């Protein structure tokens, strides 16, 4: 502990010097070596012994991570590195590479200004590399590149020196292509990666060595010498001459921006408030004396301290006892402790100034994504957009009935810690549902509930999450209130694909200027008249008021929207969420007396009209899809392809490199159960594979009724698909 305490003192000494701070994330595809790299950097900072680096997996402190050999959470740590005679503070977050935990990567990218992208020299850029790079660039985070496992290329693939240079060059070119296609403006402004200037390092995290061009000039050790060291099994000697932490940390300090530099531009990406307001100016300048602006990116429950909220402080200074406002919460929360993270350990410090990553307790009303400020009127930060959506659900029940109240509380707490997890608690049926990113995600959450929260649970086999939508138009459909005094006429049709994309990307919200919102909708393909009459949207569904001059409508609109929301939260086909529909209110007849047009009259009338309208508009069920990427030797290709095609998969592309083939396919999530074992046996265990969320697509027509029947039976509903008249009973 003495050693850590000393490092903590050096960290605190640098906190007030934002020009000497680097907030960075380490991102990569699964198993490309992020956590092993993190260990090396920590060993270089004196936090763990060099011998244990790569074996200790300091950042994978959860027993589940160590048992599975993967990173599940984003762990953060602060350390000190000396560069050109000055000390620098590096706040580092190690992120997961498995697609099921991509939400952790997205949230970590909000807290950092730079990212070290780790790529396996042998496998090259993989699908998840592309995903994490896109997340970084979307958040205005600058990348540098570490090409890992160079020793594998030399010793396993036995490539010649010339071939090695070509292959390494290809890895850099591929990453540059991705950066250019995603963010050309920054690419041209100097974000292009170039081995010659030192924004790329090469090495082996497992054997603790790395080189970069600036370091080659200092040490005289270049690729030829590295090749010889690896071939003659003298990598231990190489790690003493070219320690990994020097090459990588030097690259971080030279190329990744300090908070002072980064916040000038990043604030405009992640915050849409008034830049000339006191908080806007303070954040742009990273001013420790300005109003507090803190964004929560992670919440973890500490058994002793309670909820610990970790996040990035963009302006102001956090001090114990401070009363702060949380976006969307009417009362203030008081900070109880302020600290920094050292992996699993939280070290308390007196105060934390702007530009740092802080871990605080006392913000009991905060959730991931909350804006915390000393200014009650601060515009909140942009919401954190997750790349994937939940695609699988499990039903959870307590083994002992006496644990039921505790289970409900634990599930609420778990949803707070992990926003990519959707928890629905049906108070009527007593069924608790957890929807997550995949089998592994749900399995890990269930294990943690039992281990950390002490609740014995039973889970059902995973069920796929479906969506409901329409392919045709219907209406006007008349919805009558129970007292027959109010009538609503609603048309239903599919929402334009361009508008759906705009909604998914979060490009519009109801707080925007109407003119700006209308312009974006028209550009996305919406009719001018309809764009003017848009009243609200929920998810990717939109409600329009096409009526003119109807008395009492304005004061009833809130109830109408409530009815619309109820109808699309649980659609008519099988009570699954609705997506991609447009509901148009074309006529209304309202009772003049407000008593006769209250919630009990308006909400069911609108809900039934929307539900019946969906059933009349050629309804369809959408199923979640995944891209599947498989790298396999040519002689095993047949086994892999028949496995894909036998599961309703479609092969999109095939690329050959050497004797390896990369297959890109698209498959329904419903067919992915047991895929890991099947692909292993189909290719004699020689396939490398990964997946990525590919959105929702209509289920084949010949499977629709069967699937609907199964879902309805499982939910305890009448098995037959309902008809419009079921919802329009007089």
Swiss-Prot record:
Keywords per UniProt: Cytoplasm, Elongation factor, GTP-binding, Nucleotide-binding, Protein biosynthesis
PROSITE patterns found in the cross-reference section: G_TR_1 (PS00301), G_TR_2 (PS51722)
Binding of GTP, residues: 28-35, 94-98, 148-151
Presence of the UniProt keyword Cell cycle in the record: no
Signal sequence bounds: none
Main location: cytoplasm
GO cellular component annotations of the record: cytosol; ribonucleoprotein complex
Gene Ontology molecular function: GTP binding; GTPase activity; translation elongation factor activity
Coiled coil location: none
Parts of the chain that traverse the membrane: none
Function text: Catalyzes the GTP-dependent ribosomal translocation step during translation elongation. During this step, the ribosome changes from the pre-translocational (PRE) to the post-translocational (POST) state as the newly formed A-site-bound peptidyl-tRNA and P-site-bound deacylated tRNA move to the P and E sites, respectively. Catalyzes the coordinated movement of the two tRNA molecules, the mRNA and conformational changes in the ribosome.
Entry's family note: Belongs to the TRAFAC class translation factor GTPase superfamily. Classic translation factor GTPase family. EF-G/EF-2 subfamily.
Protein name in UniProt: Elongation factor 2
Organism: Methanothrix thermoacetophila (strain DSM 6194 / JCM 14653 / NBRC 101360 / PT) (Methanosaeta thermophila)
Organism ancestry: Archaea, Methanobacteriati, Methanobacteriota, Stenosarchaea group, Methanomicrobia
Gene that this sequence comes from: fusA
């Amino acid at each position: 502990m003495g050693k850590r305490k000393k490092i903590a003192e050096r960290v605190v000494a640098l906190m007030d010097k934002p020009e000497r701070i680097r907030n960075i994330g380490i991102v990569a595809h699964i198993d490309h070596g992020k956590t092993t790299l993190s260990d090396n950097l920590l060993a270089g900072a004196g936090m763990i012994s060099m011998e244990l680096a790569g074996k200790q997996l300091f950042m994978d402190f959860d027993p589940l991570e160590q048992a599975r050999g993967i990173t599940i959470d984003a762990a953060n740590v602060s350390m000190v590195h000396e560069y050109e005679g000055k000390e620098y503070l590096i706040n580092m977050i190690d992120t997961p590479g498995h697609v099921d935990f991509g939400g952790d990567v997205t949230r970590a990218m909000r807290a950092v200004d730079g990212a070290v992208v780790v790529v396996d020299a042998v496998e090259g850029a993989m699908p998840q590399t592309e995903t994490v790079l896109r997340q970084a660039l979307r958040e205005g985070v600058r990348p540098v590149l570490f090409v890992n496992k160079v020793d594998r290329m030399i010793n396993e693939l036995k490539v010649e020196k010339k071939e090695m240079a070509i292959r390494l060059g290809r890895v850099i070119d591929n990453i540059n292509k991705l950066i250019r296609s995603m963010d050309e403006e920054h690419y041209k402004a100097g974000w292009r990666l170039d081995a010659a200037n030192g924004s790329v390092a090469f090495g082996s995290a497992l054997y603790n060595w790395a080189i970069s061009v600036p370091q080659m000039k200092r040490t005289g050790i270049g690729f030829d010498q590295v090749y010889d060291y690896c071939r003659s099994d003298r990598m231990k000697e190489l790690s003493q001459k070219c320690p990994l932490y020097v090459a990588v940390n030097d690259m971080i300090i030279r190329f990744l921006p300090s908070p002072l530099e980064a916040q000038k531009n990043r604030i405009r990406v992640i915050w849409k408030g008034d830049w000339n307001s006191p908080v806007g100016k303070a954040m742009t300048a990273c001013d420790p004396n300005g109003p507090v602006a803190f964004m929560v990116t992670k919440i973890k429950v500490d058994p002793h301290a309670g909820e610990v909220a970790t996040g990035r402080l963009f302006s102001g200074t956090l001090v114990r006892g401070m009363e702060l406002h949380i976006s969307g919460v009417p009362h203030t929360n008081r900070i109880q402790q302020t600290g920094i993270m050292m992996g699993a350990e939280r070290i308390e410090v007196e105060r934390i100034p702007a530009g740092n990553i802080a871990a605080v307790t006392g913000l009991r009303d905060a959730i991931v994504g909350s804006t915390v400020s000393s200014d009650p009127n601060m515009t909140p930060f942009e919401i954190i957009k997750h790349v994937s959506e939940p695609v699988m659900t499990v039903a959870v029940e307590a083994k002992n009935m006496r644990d039921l109240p505790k289970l409900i509380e634990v599930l609420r707490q778990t949803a707070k810690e992990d926003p990519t997890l959707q928890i629905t608690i049906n108070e009527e049926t007593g069924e608790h549902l957890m929807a997550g990113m995949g089998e592994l995600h749900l399995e890990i959450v269930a294990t943690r509930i039992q281990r950390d929260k002490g609740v014995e649970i039973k889970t059902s086999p995973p069920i796929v999450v479906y969506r409901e939508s329409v392919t045709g138009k219907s209406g006007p459909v008349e919805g009558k209130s129970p007292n027959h005094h109010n009538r609503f006429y609603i048309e239903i049709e599919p929402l334009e694909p361009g508008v759906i994309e705009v909604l998914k990307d979060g490009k519009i919200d109801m707080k925007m200027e109407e003119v700006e919102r209308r312009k974006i909708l028209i550009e996305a393909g919406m009719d001018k008249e309809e764009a003017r009459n848009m009243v609200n949207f929920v998810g990717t569904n939109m409600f329009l008021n096409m009526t003119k001059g109807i008395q009492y409508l304005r004061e009833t609109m809130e109830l109408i929207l409530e009815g619309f929301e109820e109808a699309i939260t649980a659609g008519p086909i099988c009570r699954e969420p609705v997506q991609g529909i447009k509901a148009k209110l074309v006529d209304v007849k309202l009772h003049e007396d407000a008593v006769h047009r209250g919630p009990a009259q308006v909400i069911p009338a609108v809900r039934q009209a929307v539900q019946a309208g969906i059933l009349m508009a050629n309804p369809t069920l959408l199923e979640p899809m995944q891209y599947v990427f498989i790298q396999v030797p040519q002689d095993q290709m047949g086994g892999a392809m028949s496995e894909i095609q036998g599961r309703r998969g479609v092969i999109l592309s095939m690329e050959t490199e050497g004797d390896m083939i990369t297959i890109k396919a698209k498959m329904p999530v419903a067919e992915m159960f047991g895929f890991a074992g099947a692909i292993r046996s189909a290719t004699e265990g020689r396939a490398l594979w990964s997946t990525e969320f590919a959105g929702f697509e209509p289920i084949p027509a010949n499977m629709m009724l069967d699937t609907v029947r199964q879902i309805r039976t499982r939910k305890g509903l009448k098995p037959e698909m309902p008809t419009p008249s079921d919802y329009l009973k007089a």
